[in-house]
From Swiss-Prot:
ATP binds at G178, V179, T180, S181, S182, G183, K184, T185. GO terms for molecular function: ATP binding; microtubule binding; microtubule motor activity; zinc ion binding. Residues 98-415 form the Kinesin motor domain. Residues 1-23 have a biased composition (Low complexity). The lineage of its organism: Eukaryota, Viridiplantae, Streptophyta, Embryophyta, Tracheophyta. Residues 1-36, 826-856, 926-963 are annotated as: Disordered. It comes from the Eukaryota. This is Kinesin-like protein KIN-7D, mitochondrial. InterPro entries: Kinesin-like_fam, Kinesin_motor_CS, Kinesin_motor_dom, Kinesin_motor_dom_sf, P-loop_NTPase, Znf_RING, Znf_RING/FYVE/PHD. Keywords: ATP-binding, Coiled coil, Metal-binding, Microtubule, Mitochondrion, Motor protein, Nucleotide-binding, Transit peptide, Zinc, Zinc-finger. GO terms for biological process: microtubule-based movement; regulation of defense response. The gene is KIN7D. Gene3D superfamilies: Kinesin motor domain (3.40.850.10), Zinc/RING finger domain, C3HC4 (zinc finger) (3.30.40.10). Residues 937-954 have a biased composition (Basic and acidic residues).
Length: 1055
């Protein structure tokens, strides 16, 4: 444990690559131009009306932004700064690259410490992950972070280059992958103390906008989740079960809601609202485990301002939090098990797609097998930069899951991508041309009015005057229409300009003399949004504190979200345009003052409420009270600034003439300042490089000193060994020889034991063959008995039918005799002799005595004899019916016994299939086991047992030999049961050995490892893992346990 933990503390020295790239980037910082026309603003904002676009999974990376962020290495190379410096080039750049893979270890949890888990995987340096118990098993990645690393460190390496390149027109995607409870959601979202990748990326986006003058930006966000293969819109609770569509640009989600964001707090408020609708649940590892994949998409549109405008650059930044794959260790049931099966299927499909892409062959890639892979199709197919963050746990209890995650990351590292910049070529370049033509025409018109054009005759002037009068009527109507259109256009410009974000850096107060009035007000409105952000960051001390305050406002106080949004939209900047202001602009400032006054009143009431509540919990409420007081002071300062602007607006018109000269001087000073800052940045970068080189030299010097000391110690040890007597060497060699002899003896004993076991198994197999032959003979005898019983049943049935016919006839005759006895008069004399003769003649047919007409009167029927004969027939009929019922009962018992024998036969087949797998393993360990004449003893044993059961039951059903049946059972049972018991005991021992050899075998191994519903029914080849049901084994192309390709499958019947 101590050795493994010490290995995690190693870190790589900072790379100078990022510092140089940052220096190149700052070279292209230019002052912002405020001469953007109204028509260009309309066209740039018109991109909002386009259809909803889904996150395009493409990625971009580049160096770090700003002059103060040096020494952070980029895991993969990115487009050069010279290419990124000219975003409006008609040629689209592309560069062959690979997916950036970063691995982050989380520390052991308290539960894992209590359970006694040890460190099974550890980071070996900055790029290697190595197994503790098998050091030869290692994986190399772009960057590996130990448990002590912070989320900011991970963001600087894995996500910051992607975010920066996305702001320059290259699509980017960052997603976290790992098993459940490995720290994916913590890495992507974080908390108040340690923000995650998504909050840091949002903050970085707005800081890049601040540092990029001369460009205007439009930001939109969308937030969706994939829950049980159903896409839901987290920003719109009514948007459920959305569909995925495809067009020329790639895949997108139809009907997804997109929101325009104006500040980091605004964007974080949408994330907080979406997280309230996300599906979470608890399991054995995590109290709040993610049950769905989420995709947060930031769409960026940017264009250059002023005369340099050439088109619009569009890019998408996708930040994905995948749900963790689950094993049977989570012990989920019901809905949680169903959710886990959907998560595992989507992640298994993602692994299959990554595997096929890593092969580089022209094969079918199953993107459509899952909603996740279909949405990631454009990213994985290589149209942008991709950054994969794999979160793993070092615990020994999850060693196999960690190994699978590392295999997945290693495959993803080999996928090639081609990052390219997106560009929207629209009609804006034509609008610029038209505007230049209009300006030249206006110049000519001014020259005509001043009479600067000579050589025009009186006749030409009269004709021109006549044409002018004719066109006045038409122009009047057109002018009215244009006025109406202009009013509508102005209102639309004011609305759309509020959504466009620009930088306030290097903006000069009052530099708006050549800009139209409405354009000046729009630019001021855009400046206000970001000036307020700068003021907040200056007051709070650092950008991180600003982000924490904004996230607190969006998460902790929902009632303040609307007021914060209004403050972001309407708060004035410290550098508001101070030129000649129109009454509309002054009214706008007055309205902003009123809104600020209302927000101050609302914040004051909130502060009073918090002060009242702080009596119960003063510690937690103290920070909120301080933040509110700071916010109230800031808004009061902004309101005073607005009032000062209103007062100074009148004075600005007087000093307008001299202000232009001052602005030119300030501009020249600003350019000089930029040059000096650039030189200073280069000097600081060189200084950092020299410091890094000095540190490297120092470390090399220390290593050389350590090597010298080590060599001196070895030299002393060698000299002492040479001086020691040779008897010690002999003693050591003798001890070593004794140890070798003991090992050889123990191995010989083990070999003898294995040979004895082998002989016993062969004897047991021969005994089982003999029993199979006996049981086969008994089965044939049982079949003969069954056929004889069937023939006898048929005979009995025919006899019963005959007896029933005779019974009906006798009943009819008895009824006729009774009728005759009632009609006849009683006779006085009885002839005894005749009666005896009549009784002897009744054994024949009675109808024959009725044939003689002359003796009919002398006929006398005895009803008692008839009753006795009828009773005898009834008794015989009852006996036959009871015999038939007994036969049917015996036949039912035979059927039940046959079904039970079939069930036992199936159970024996499964047991013997497992036994033969174990026998095959024994063959590999102890040598080839001789095959018994091409016969299958397992199959014979099953048949023999089933035949024995049939024979026992048939013999037991025989009515004449009950004693023989008991003797047969008692004789056969002692012969069979010991052999079967020995076989079962041997199989149980082999199973226990196999379970002990596997360090992390699943407790519920009889359940499918993908769907967690059906029992396992397939043995996968060549890995021989019995872990999937029949349907999942046909659907999967690789084993979910060891990730090896499935070449064939053996299906078994569950017992």
């Amino acid at each position: 444990m101590a050795s493994s933990s010490s290995r995690t503390r190693s870190s790589r020295p900072p790379s100078p690559a990022s510092s140089t790239s940052s220096s190149h980037l700052s070279n292209r910082l230019i002052p912002r131009s405020n001469s953007t026309s109204a028509s260009s603003l309309i066209t740039s904002a018109a991109g909002i009306a386009s259809r909803s676009m889904t996150p395009s999974r493409t990625f971009s990376d580049s160096g770090l932004i700003g002059s103060g962020s040096f020494g952070i290495g980029s895991p993969v190379p990115y487009p050069s700064e010279e290419l990124l410096g000219d975003p409006m080039d008609d040629t689209i750049s592309s560069e062959r690259d690979s997916i950036s893979v970063t691995v982050r270890f989380r520390p052991l949890s308290d539960r894992e410490y209590q359970r006694g888990d040890e460190v099974a995987w550890y980071p070996d340096g900055d790029t290697l992950v190595r197994h503790e118990y098998n050091p030869l098993t290692a994986y190399a990645f772009d960057k590996v972070f130990g448990p002590q690393a912070t989320t900011i460190d991970v963001y600087d390496v894995a996500a910051r280059p992607v975010v920066k390149a996305a702001m320059e027109g290259v699509n980017g995607t960052v997603f976290a992958y790992g098993v459940t409870s490995s720290g994916k959601t913590h890495t992507m979202h974080g908390d108040q103390e340690s923000p995650g990748i998504i909050p840091l990326a949002i903050k970085d986006v707005f800081s890049i906008i601040q540092d990029t003058p001369g460009r205007e930006f439009l930001l939109r966000v969308s937030y969706l989740e994939i829950y049980n293969e159903v896409i839901n819109d987290l920003l719109d609770p009514t948007g459920q079960n959305l569909r995925v569509r495809e067009d020329s640009q790639g895949t997108y989600v139809e009907g997804i809601k997109e929101e325009v964001v104006l500040s980091p707090g605004h964007a974080l408020s949408f994330i907080a609202a979406g997280e309230e609708h996300r599906h979470v649940g608890s399991n054995n590892f995590n109290l709040l485990s993610s049950r769905s994949h989420t995709i947060f998409t930031l769409m960026v549109e940017s264009s250059a301002t002023g005369d340099e405008y050439d088109g619009v650059i569009f890019s998408q930044l996708n930040l994905i939090d995948l749900a963790g794959s689950e094993s049977s260790k989570t012990e989920t049931t019901g809905l949680r098990r169903k959710e886990g099966s959907y998560i595992n299927k989507s992640l298994l499909t993602l692994g299959t797609v990554i595997g096929k892409l890593s092969e580089g062959k022209a094969t079918h890639i199953p993107y459509r097998d899952s909603k996740l892979t279909r949405l990631l199709q454009s990213s994985l197919s290589g149209h942008g930069h991709v950054s994969l963050i794999c979160t793993i746990t070092p615990a020994s209890s999850s060693s196999e899951e960690t190994h699978n995650t590392l295999k997945f990351a290693s495959r993803a590292k080999s996928i090639e991508i081609y990052a390219s910049r997106n560009q929207i070529i629209d009609e804006k370049s034509l609008i610029k041309k038209y505007q230049r033509e209009i300006s030249t025409l206006k110049l000519e018109l001014d020259q005509l009015r001043r009479g600067m054009l000579v050589g025009v005759s009186h006749e030409e002037l009269m004709s021109l005057k006549q044409q002018l009068e004719e066109g006045q009527v038409k122009m009047q109507s057109r002018l009215e229409e244009e006025e109406e259109a202009k009013a509508a256009l102005m209102s639309r410009i004011q609305k759309l300009t509020k959504l466009i974000l620009v930088s306030t850096k290097n903006s000069i107060p009052g530099y708006s003399g050549d800009i139209p009035t409405h354009q000046r007000s729009l630019s001021a409105g855009k400046d206000d949004k970001f000036d307020s952000l700068l003021l907040e960051s200056d007051n709070l001390g650092s950008p991180s504190s600003t982000l924490a305050l904004l996230s607190e406002g969006s998460l902790g106080f929902n009632h303040r979200r609307s007021s914060s949004k209004l403050n972001d939209e309407n708060s004035p900047g410290a550098e508001f345009t101070q030129g000649v202001m129109t009454p509309d602009e002054i009214d706008l400032l007055v309205e902003q003052v009123k809104m600020l006054a209302g927000e101050i009143a609302f914040s004051t009431s909130t502060l009073k409420r918090l002060v009242d509540q702080s009596v119960n919990d003063p510690e937690n409420s103290q920070t909120q009270i301080q933040n509110l007081e700071r916010e109230i002071h800031e808004k009061q300062r902004q309101m005073r600034g607005l009032e000062q602007l209103i007062i100074e607006s009148g004075e600005a018109s007087i000093a307008n003439a001299s202000l232009v000269e001052m602005q030119q001087k300030v501009m020249s000073l600003m350019t000089q300042c930029n040059e000096k800052s650039f030189e200073l940045e280069i000097k600081s970068a060189d200084n950092c490089i020299l410091q890094e080189q000095l540190q490297e030299k120092c470390t090399e010097n220390k290593e050389l000193h350590e090597k010298v000391n080590l060599l001196e110690q070895r030299l002393n040890a060698v000299s002492s060994e040479k001086s020691s007597p040779s008897c010690s060497n002999k003693a050591v060699s003798g001890e070593y020889a004794d140890e070798l002899k003991k090992k050889i003896q123990s191995q010989e004993i083990e070999n003898e034991e294995l040979k004895l076991e082998h002989v016993q198994i062969v004897e047991e197999n021969s005994g089982l063959r003999v029993q199979n032959q006996k049981l086969a003979e008994e089965a044939s005898y049982a079949k003969e008995l069954a056929s004889a019983a069937a023939v006898e049943l048929k005979n009995l049935a025919s006899e019963v039918t005959k007896l029933s016919l005779q019974n009906t006839k006798l009943e009819k005759e008895l009824a006729a005799a009774r009728d005759l006895a009632q009609t006849r008069n009683p006779m006085n004399g009885v002839n005894r002799k005749y009666n005896d003769g009549a009784r002897s003649g009744r054994k024949g047919r009675i109808s024959s005595s009725r044939s003689s007409g002359d003796e009919f009167d002398a006929w006398n029927l005895d009803p008692e004899d008839l009753k006795m004969e009828l009773q005898v027939r009834k008794q015989r009929e009852v006996a036959l019916e009871s015999a038939l019922a007994e036969k049917e009962f015996i036949e039912d018992e035979y059927r039940k016994k046959a079904e039970e024998a079939k069930r036992r036969e199936e159970a024996l087949e499964n047991d013997l299939a497992n036994m033969w797998v174990l026998v095959a393993k024994l063959k590999k360990d102890n040598g080839a086991l001789p095959e018994p004449n091409g016969t299958d003893p397992g199959r014979e044993l099953e048949k023999s047992q089933s035949h024995a059961v049939l024979k026992e039951r048939q013999v037991s059903s025989a009515p004449r030999q009950p004693e023989v049946v008991v003797v047969a059972k008692t004789e056969e049972t002692p012969k069979e049961e010991p052999l079967v018991a020995r076989l079962k005991a041997r199989m149980q021992e082999m199973k226990e050995k196999e379970m002990k050899s596997q360090a992390n075998g699943d407790a519920n191994s009889h359940i499918c490892k993908v769907c967690f519903e059906s029992p396992t029914a397939a043995i996968l080849l060549p890995c021989r893992h019995f872990c999937l049901c029949k349907s999942c084994s046909l659907a999967c192309s690789e084993c979910p346990i060891c990730r090896t390709k499935i070449s064939d499958r053996l299906f078994a019947f569950p017992s």
